Amino acid sequence: MKQRQLGKNGPMVSTVCFGAWPIGGGMGKVDQTQAIKTIHSAIESGVNFFDTAEGYNTSEMVLGKALEGKRHNIVLASKLSGEDHSIGHIRNAINNSLKVLKTDYIDIYQLHTPQPNWPIEDTMSELVKLKQEGKILHIGLSNYSVEETISATACTSIQSSQPRYNLIFNNEEKATLEFCYQNGIGIMAHSVLAKGLLTGKYKAGHIFEEDDERKLFNFFRGTLFDVINKLVQELNGWAIERNRNVTQLAIAWVLAQRPVTSAIVGMKTLDQVEQARLSSEWDLTQSELGEVSNIIGTFKPKWVKDPVS
């Protein structure tokens, strides 16, 4: 699998990053043995980049087990989750992550979401100390707006940013991507398949299990789902004409966007690993990108997560 450098002076990472949210149970129950097999299959396919988080349920624990004996070849990214950015919690969080991941350092340690109640200067100062201590190698951000990114970079250098970015939901992140590109900050795009929506797998009226967080997203139900699903089917038809499918198209499209270093793809099965591998090998031409853009047109929905009424 191809690799790209993450940021100005960061590590070389595979163009597909293994997104470990699903193996933590965020999208329903996952058999741990199957999850570990999937992780090993991804490594065999050339994936050297793994993204997890403190808040991904059992994800760090499963990943830690799977990477035993393989850690030296892996670029590992995790995140400080939750609303507490106090010095004490940051210390507890990194130590817990190191313990369950069975490692003594994390390559990219990211702030999962902005927390305006905590001064960014204090938070970044503590991350710099962790870097000096060797517990983390690089600092990253996740889900930060361009204004929030600018504030963070005023405190210290940032290696990566992790915005939500995909074929359908991409309008709100453009300013962040451009700032990062101009300032040598690597982009790890998440939700490239829109939580599975861009696979074409889900039909109208699909009911998610109680332990599947996707039941909270507005685009999996109602009129918005119908509109997006119709578009996904059209994109799938276009991809099939090229002996591909819409899953591969969605990943390849993200990788074709100039600022993107790596596309984070959630994987729970061996087939999903294979789809990701095939996607990484598809270099969309400018002509093809234009055709895809014409299919999508001016449709720019907003990403909303809310309680199901």
Language model feature labels by segment:
Residues 73-85, 108-111:
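A short, structured active-site edge motif that brings together acidic residues
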Residues 51-52, 76-78, 141, 187-189:
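Hydrophobic residues in well-ordered beta-strands that form the structural core
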Residues 1-74:
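N-terminal binding-site loop/beta-alpha segment at the start of enzyme catalytic domains
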Residues 7-10, 64-72, 95-102, 131, ...:
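Acidic (Asp/Glu)-rich catalytic clusters
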Residues 21-32, 79-88, 115-118:
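Active-site mouth loops of central-metabolism enzymes
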Residues 114, 118-294, 299, 308:
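Beta/alpha (TIM)-barrel catalytic core signal, keyed to glycine-rich beta->alpha loops juxtaposed to Asp/Glu
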Residues 29-42, 86-101, 145-150:
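Short, acidic/polar
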Residues 98-119:
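Active-site groove signature of glycoside hydrolases
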